[in-house]
Amino acid sequence: MAFSKIDLRNFRCFDSLSIDLSCKSSLFHGKNGCGKTSILESIYVASSGRSFRTSNLESLIKKGAEAFNIRAYDDNTGSILEVNKAKTKPINIKINNSKVTISELVRAFPSFSIDSKTFFYNDNAPEYRRKQLDRGLFIASSDYSKDWFGYFRSLKQRNSALKLGDIAQAKAYDPLLVDHGERLNLLRENLITEVKEIYDEIVSKLIQENKRAD
């Protein structure tokens, strides 16, 4: 699914704003501080339930307001997405008036944020690189989320058993950790291979264009 229109209310610096996104690509321009990044942030919040700027969603509520509201529309499917975040309350997400989880939202409206950190991907901390990789795989593969949650659930239970000194119980989780871990690594390797092929193709085209320009 893709957004064709998005309406904002009490989000960041905006009292009310409606944006047409029906074109294949959109360009936002304006002076510093006018809210360009906030528009991009609102689209990301609408498609992921999270912000790429802060972990505190309450800070996105316009000063003096009690909540922010985002409504996004997909003309191709007729779907209407609504995201509400009130102070001291958890985020509330609905698709066609039915409440959904963040994982369901991400699958319905897959998106990926390319920001300043992305340009220095290899220089960033391993945790950041894993998160970016995991997000792409969560969107691309339903099996990945099953194995990801299975792996960390088994790891948590294994660590709890170790804290209690129950070595036999801890060892019982080893096969699950190995099984889920191997599948996670395979999916990650496959994604990296696919991305490398696309990257090599783009670089090859750029080299050819530069040669023609010379």
What are these regions (language model features)?
Residues 47-128, 137-140, 144, 196-204:
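Nucleotide-state sensing region of NTPase/ATPase domains
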Residues 1-45:
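Pre-Walker A-like glycine/lysine-rich segment at the N-terminus of P-loop NTPase domains
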